[in-house]
């Protein structure tokens, strides 16, 4: 901080000898204050000391001392305001980094030392303990003050911040709390006037000697100017005295580091994309509001500095050049800026000349090109560019269902309802006796206390009642949703801020009567009310307001509360888009931005609608009449499956408390909502469907077995076959579910039968995905299992893929049914086709398993499957692999097969001779195919391929001759490939 500047020039009057002025000591409690102190207090806070000296030619020294004594600020609230943040510190820091808190700790630890007040100047030393291993640090602090305001500060620390450092706070609080312990002296000019020439010379020389390194150049320069007769310093009467207080013309305001404020705002705006930057700017706005509340002129000064930096934000020109709107965070900051200017200009405490100066400033700023519009969504100024008029029927409807002024009071740029409501509540607010850094924040936030303050001239009225009436009047007004994303978002935010104010008010009997009266008026308000019977389709919904009214009225008038909330459940824009009885084109996408391009906040409004419905369901627990009424309203007005599902979950959770029996009616409501969600999303693919289906089964389980069987019996309209077979039937028959239901044997079998019927129906409808789950579910019932098996056989003829058939066949083998597994494997092979070059076909392992199965069953099954293998598989390596596997052991030696041969089958005998011929033919065909487009880098692979072919050829009695003829044929046919043929000769001769 910079050292305080010299104040005003003073003459050197010959004052009386200094007398003791010990009147600063605190007076005993209950004793009247001296007239001298009463007068000095009033003068000290209203008049500059220069004005006192001009008015009275001689001011006695005791009077001077009392005026100087009382000129220092007397309240810690101002010190706190100029040394604390406007928002709570991060979690865990416990205000440790707030200068006011640190200064208070320094004061309480005895760190303040050598405090001296000379006139209007206070100085002292602050000893701050160092970090572990570091020495104690000493800081010298100087404070200048005038008319109960600190006008400048100086500290030896390097802390550069918007407000006072902890050392300034410690010294200021010491002066306020221990004023009688501070040594008090009159301004230094008064002391100098009592010295003769020798004393003055000695004083100056001692001063220069003590600080020669700092003041010697300045002292020599001043001496030269004084000795020069025509110098400027000799033309001025008197000399400056930094301890003599401010002059008459000097501004009387608290010290504010303007340069630091400008730098801080500039830096924060450049980091505007970060949450912390916006938070700190809001903190500065809060500080301005605090200053305005305390009628501190620095509020307007600080706001001017901030506005200038906002207008110099480089992003404004960029957004204007690109034709893009400003970000949401930035728009909110500009809104706050505008709201503060409204408070400043309309303040009843400002002077007319101040207001005129501010208006001139605002007009100049408004003419700047970069100054953003208050509503940036209206960009067409020319009459020819205006949007065309809406269709006549819509205009007629709008005229009959909406008030003349379509611009609502809530969400208006000037926020008339919010300002009026806050002003009325401020008049009723009880003052806090204790000093609090953050009265509106923190985990231990106390509820604000309000009291009824009567309105003068209006018997029976109070400002608190008026505040409630005004707020409900604005919130319940029917108003069209404005154009543009930000304007719509502002409507929502203003509404929430207004309701937050109302929630702070504790409702007594008087306010409850007002609430009931206003609720009745809103229900009967016609087109002027958002709760009226007829709404314009683009009216702002009343969900948030209705939720507050419902909660407030419920203990006092439940019938009125439900009627109001049910009326507010409407969302007119969706009622128009989805007429009753018509199917929704896309149930999951109720927003449908292409159909509602202007309703940017529709998702938020639907969420608020859901919250209102959830509140009503929770409140209606135990009341079947209202529960079914609320359910009907939900089914009629809520069109989002995701929100309906959330409502169903909330209702189920509320209906099943941990330490109480479940509410069966509310559980039924939850199930009904879940069923509606299932029907709405049946034909829509969404990642949440599986979660929804599982939850529905668990909800039905909570109700009982009949509910579970009902959803199984009506699965066609609720689930896909896969969901029904793999989730509903399986989950509904798990051990945990059966234990939960606590069924006897007959009821358990009834549930199992229902699940098996469901599984068979799903298998018939979608055998490809449901056949195996159906077989698994029907394992314990022979007839059902046979029916499921027959469904698989029928589906195989109808196009069931080989992969699914192989899967079911493996399942059959695992179940100990090898013949059925063999049957399904042959059906799968009949559909399979593996080309000569598909060595890594996905079905290779399945084919080898099928061959192994047939070999284990016996020669008859092996003979039957060979033609299928030859017809389906044309890959030579696969055929030779199968052939070798079958020749390793005798058929029928498997664990389930009969021993029908004493030795392995020969490859040259039936039934394997056909397979051998097929393998040889496949090798010959594949070789010719590969040689057609072979490249030199594949010669090595081809030679290896011929090596495997020779092994297969040699399985035949005349295999050696066949292979030699095959090679000769290759050499003659492909004699142009000399290098390849050379490699063939080297390997095979």
Swiss-Prot record:
Transmembrane segments: none annotated. Residues 1-32 are annotated as: Disordered. One of its GO terms (cellular component) is Cul2-RING ubiquitin ligase complex. Keywords: Metal-binding, Zinc, Zinc-finger. GO terms for molecular function: zinc ion binding. A zinc finger (SWIM-type) spans 139-176. PROSITE patterns: ZF_SWIM. This is Zinc finger SWIM domain-containing protein 4. It comes from Homo sapiens. The lineage of its organism: Eukaryota, Metazoa, Chordata, Craniata, Vertebrata.
């Amino acid at each position: 901080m910079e050292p305080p500047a010299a104040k005003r020039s003073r003459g050197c009057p010959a004052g009386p000898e200094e007398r003791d002025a010990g009147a600063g000591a605190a007076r005993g409690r209950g004793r009247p204050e001296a007239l001298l102190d009463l007068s000095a207090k009033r003068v000290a806070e209203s008049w500059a000391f220069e004005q006192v000296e001009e008015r009275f030619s001689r001011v006695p020294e005791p009077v001077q001392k009392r005026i100087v004594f009382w000129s220092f600020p007397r309240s810690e609230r101002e010190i706190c305001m100029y040394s604390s943040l406007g928002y709570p510190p991060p979690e865990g820091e416990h205000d440790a980094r707030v200068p006011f808190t640190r200064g208070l700790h320094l004061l309480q630890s005895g760190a303040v030392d050598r405090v001296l007040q000379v006139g209007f100047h206070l100085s002292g030393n602050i000893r701050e303990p160092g970090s572990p291993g570091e020495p104690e640090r000493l800081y010298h602090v100087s404070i200048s003050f005038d008319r109960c305001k600190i006008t400048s500060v100086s500290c030896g620390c390097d802390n550069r911040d918007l407000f006072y450092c902890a050392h300034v706070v410690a010294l200021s609080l010491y002066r306020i709390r221990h004023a009688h312990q501070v040594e008090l002296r009159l301004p230094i000019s008064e002391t100098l006037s009592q010295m003769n020439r020798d004393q003055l010379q000695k004083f100056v020389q001692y001063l220069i000697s003590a600080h020669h390194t700092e003041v010697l150049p300045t002292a020599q320069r001043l001496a030269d100017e004084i000795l020069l007769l025509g110098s400027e310093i000799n033309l001025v009467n008197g000399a400056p005295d930094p301890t003599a207080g401010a002059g008459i013309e000097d501004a009387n305001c608290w010290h504010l580091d303007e340069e630091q404020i400008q730098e801080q705002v500039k830096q924060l705006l450049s980091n505007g994309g970060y949450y912390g930057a916006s938070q700190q700017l809001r903190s500065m706005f809060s500080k301005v509001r605090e200053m305005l509340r305390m009628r501190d002129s620095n509020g307007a000064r600080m706001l001017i500095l901030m506005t200038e930096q906002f207008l110099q934000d480089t992003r404004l020109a960029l957004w204007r050049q690109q034709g893009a709107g400003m970000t949401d965070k930035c728009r909110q900051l500009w809104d706050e800026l505008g709201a503060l200017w409204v408070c400043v200009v309309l303040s009843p405490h400002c002077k007319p000349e101040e207001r005129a100066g501010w208006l001139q400033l605002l007009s100049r700023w408004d003419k700047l090109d970069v100054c953003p519009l208050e509503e940036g969504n209206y960009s067409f100024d020319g009459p020819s560019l205006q949007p065309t008029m809406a269709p006549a029927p819509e205009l007629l409807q709008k005229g009959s269902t909406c008030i003349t002024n379509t611009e609502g009071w809530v969400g208006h740029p000037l926020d008339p309802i919010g300002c009026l409501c806050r002003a009325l509540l401020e008049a009723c607010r009880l003052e806090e006796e204790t000093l609090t850094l953050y009265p509106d924040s923190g985990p231990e936030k106390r509820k604000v206390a309000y009291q009824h303050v009567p309105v003068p001239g209006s018997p029976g009225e109070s400002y608190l009642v008026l505040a409630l009436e005004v707020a409900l009047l604005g919130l319940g007004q029917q108003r069209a949703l404005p154009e543009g994303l930000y304007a719509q978002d502002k409507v929502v935010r203003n509404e929430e801020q207004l309701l937050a104010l109302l929630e702070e008010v504790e409702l007594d009997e008087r306010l409850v009567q007002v609430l009931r009266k206003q609720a009745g008026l809103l229900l009967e308000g016609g087109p002027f009310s958002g709760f009226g019977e007829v709404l314009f389709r683009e009216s702002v919904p009343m969900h948030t307001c209705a939720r507050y009214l419902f909660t407030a009225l419920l203990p006092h008038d439940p019938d009125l509360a439900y009627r109001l909330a049910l009326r507010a459940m409407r969302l007119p824009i969706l009622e128009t888009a989805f007429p009753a009885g018509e199917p929704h084109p896309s149930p999951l996408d109720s927003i449908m931005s292409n159909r509602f391009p202007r309703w940017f906040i529709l998702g938020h409004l639907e969420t608020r609608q859901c919250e209102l419905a959830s509140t009503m369901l929770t409140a209606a627990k135990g009341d079947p009449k209202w529960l079914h009424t609320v359910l009907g309203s939900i089914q009629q007005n809520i069109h989002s499956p995701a929100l309906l599902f959330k409502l169903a979950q909330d209702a189920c959770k509320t209906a099943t408390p941990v330490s109480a029996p479940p509410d069966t009616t509310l559980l039924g409501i939850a199930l009904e909502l879940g069923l509606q969600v299932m029907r709405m999303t049946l034909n829509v693919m969404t990642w949440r469907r599986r979660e929804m289906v599982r939850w529905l089964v668990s909800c039905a389980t909570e109700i009982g077995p009949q509910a579970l069987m009902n959803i199984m019996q009506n699965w066609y309209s609720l689930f896909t076959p896969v969901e029904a077979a793999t989730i509903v039937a399986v989950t509904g028959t798990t051990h945990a579910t059966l234990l939960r239901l606590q069924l006897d044997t007959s009821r358990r079998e009834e549930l199992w039968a229902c699940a098996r019927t469901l599984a068979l129906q799903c298998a018939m409808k979608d055998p490809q995905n449901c056949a195996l789950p159906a077989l698994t579910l029907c394992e314990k019932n022979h007839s059902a299992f046979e029916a499921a098996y027959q469904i698989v056989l029928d589906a195989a003829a109808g196009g069931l893929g080989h992969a699914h058939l192989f899967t079911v066949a493996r399942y059959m083998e695992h179940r100990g049914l090898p013949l059925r597994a063999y049957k399904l494997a042959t059906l799968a092979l009949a559909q399979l086709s593996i080309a000569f070059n598909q060595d890594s076909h996905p079905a290779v392992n399945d084919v080898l398993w099928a061959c192994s199965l047939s070999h284990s069953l016996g020669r008859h099954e092996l003979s039957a499957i060979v033609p299928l293998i030859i017809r389906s598989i044309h890959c030579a390596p696969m055929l030779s692999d199968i052939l070798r596997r079958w020749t390793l052991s005798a058929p029928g030696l498997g664990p389930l097969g009969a021993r029908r041969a004493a030795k392995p089958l020969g490859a040259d005998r039936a039934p394997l001779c056909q397979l051998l011929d097929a393998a040889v033919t496949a090798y010959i065909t594949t070789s010719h195919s590969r040689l057609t487009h072979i490249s030199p880098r594949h010669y090595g692979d081809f030679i290896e391929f011929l090596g495997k072919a020779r092994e297969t050829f040699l399985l035949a009695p005349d295999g050696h001759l066949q292979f030699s003829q095959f090679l000769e044929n290759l050499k003659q046919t492909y004699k142009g490939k000399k290098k390849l043929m050379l490699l063939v000769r080297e390997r095979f001769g």
